[in-house]
Amino acid sequence: MKMERSLNLFEEAQRYLVGGVNSPVRAFKSVGMEPLFIQKGKGSRVWDVDGNEYIDYVLSWGPLILGHANDQIVNAIKQVANYGTSFGAPTELEIEMAKAVVDAVPSIEMVRFVNSGTEATMSAIRLARGYTGKKKIVKFEGCYHGHVDSLLVSAGSGVATLSIPGTPGIPEEFANLTIVLPYNNIDAVEETFKKHGDDIACVIIEPVAGNMGVVAPSKEYHQRLREITKEYGALLIWDEVMTGFRLAYGGAQELYGIEPDLTTLGKVIGGGLPVGAYGGKREIMEYVAPVGPVYQAGTLSGNPLAMAGGLRQLQILKEKNPYPDLDRKGKKLEEGLRYLSEKYGIPATVNRVGSMITAFFTDKEVVDFETAKSSDLDRFAKFFRLMLEKGVYLAPSQFEAAFLSTAHSDEDIDETLNKAEDCFKQLL
């Protein structure tokens, strides 16, 4: 595999960008190699600056559910850009986008757009504290909710990938207000609320974890969590930055039939542009300025490019309803990987929900962060490098999801599994 130009660019990038990247996992540190520099993408494929072509299962970490450079989305962005890129003032597109979100997500009556998933979770936490008058928050080990001070405790995603236990720069006083519990363990939740229930403002959770790899709790777990938070007057926040509009048009809420108090969104709702959102019941959302006392603002929030790209993507998803076919393709990939694991005796637990999938290199059932961490990281790193050499681009971390798009064909999946078989042979 040619990498000369990528290597040269990475060397240059390290002189100007911290670590040569703008997000840590992109540095490929955990897989023992230098990163690719991507030049272009189309459909299910990306090409790097050395001309290598890959079937892409990263999809910009999830937003590109219709694949790269979808013509309708690109044209929508171009059309709006002709009139200006940002105004810092209300536009009609913001209303149309808000209507689409409220129409789709069962629990959302009002929404506020921001510029990233991190902004969305940060703002939702602030709102929950302002609304309830309480200080403590509950999160779950291995769940990643962006790089917010109060939420980086025992986090997944890059924090897990790089084996960072915490991070300097977060005062102990902040961390002390965050209670971290094991994911998928309702007994721990019940015990915590018995001790601290009167002080807990909110519980924030990925309804299907994707940032420790894909881990799905039971519907009963979510139902009990909903009951407990209601009982103690704490808000339940579902972080659907990853699952929103990906697992179903109404997100994980549509799958589970459970309505949280607040929901955070990102990724898919931007059509590949920077965007985030948080929303919920009108009574709660009207605590946000300028109607209420909880302040939150943003220079580029609701900018026309993100609204145009996101709105067109949501319109296509609503019109086409690709979710059954995405699930079918996900199942095909899941079953193929599981078959290869069994055929070659390579321990692997394959977890999937819809078009999100992770193959953990462990013989344990992966139900939480502790079992996810039992994965053989050296074996994953070797598998990643072998697949990359054969033209399959996976997330450079054991603790991330692979994503499918409508642009991935059955032929893409067949090709991926054929190449995976060659790689499994080399893992023996």
Swiss-Prot record:
User: InterPro entries recorded for this chain?
Assistant: 4pyrrol_synth_GluAld_NH2Trfase, Aminotrans_3, Aminotrans_3_PPA_site, PyrdxlP-dep_Trfase, PyrdxlP-dep_Trfase_major, PyrdxlP-dep_Trfase_small
Question: Which compartments is it annotated to reside in?
Answer: Cytoplasm
Q: Which UniProt keywords apply?
A: Cytoplasm, Isomerase, Porphyrin biosynthesis, Pyridoxal phosphate
Modified residue N6-(pyridoxal phosphate)lysine is at which positions?
A: K267
Predominant place of localization: cytoplasm
Q: What EC number is given for this enzyme?
A: 5.4.3.8
Pathway the protein acts in: Porphyrin-containing compound metabolism; protoporphyrin-IX biosynthesis; 5-aminolevulinate from L-glutamyl-tRNA(Glu): step 2/2
Which GO MF terms are attached to this record?
glutamate-1-semialdehyde 2,1-aminomutase activity; pyridoxal phosphate binding; transaminase activity
| Known cofactor(s) | pyridoxal 5'-phosphate
Q: Biological process GO terms, please?
A: protoporphyrinogen IX biosynthetic process
User: Per the record, what are the reactions this protein catalyses?
Assistant: (S)-4-amino-5-oxopentanoate = 5-aminolevulinate
Cellular component terms (Gene Ontology): cytoplasm
Q: How does it assemble?
A: Homodimer.
Name the family the entry cites: Belongs to the class-III pyridoxal-phosphate-dependent aminotransferase family. HemL subfamily.
Name of the molecule in the record: Glutamate-1-semialdehyde 2,1-aminomutase
Where does this protein come from, organism-wise?
Answer: Persephonella marina (strain DSM 14350 / EX-H1)
What gene name is given for the protein in this entry? hemL
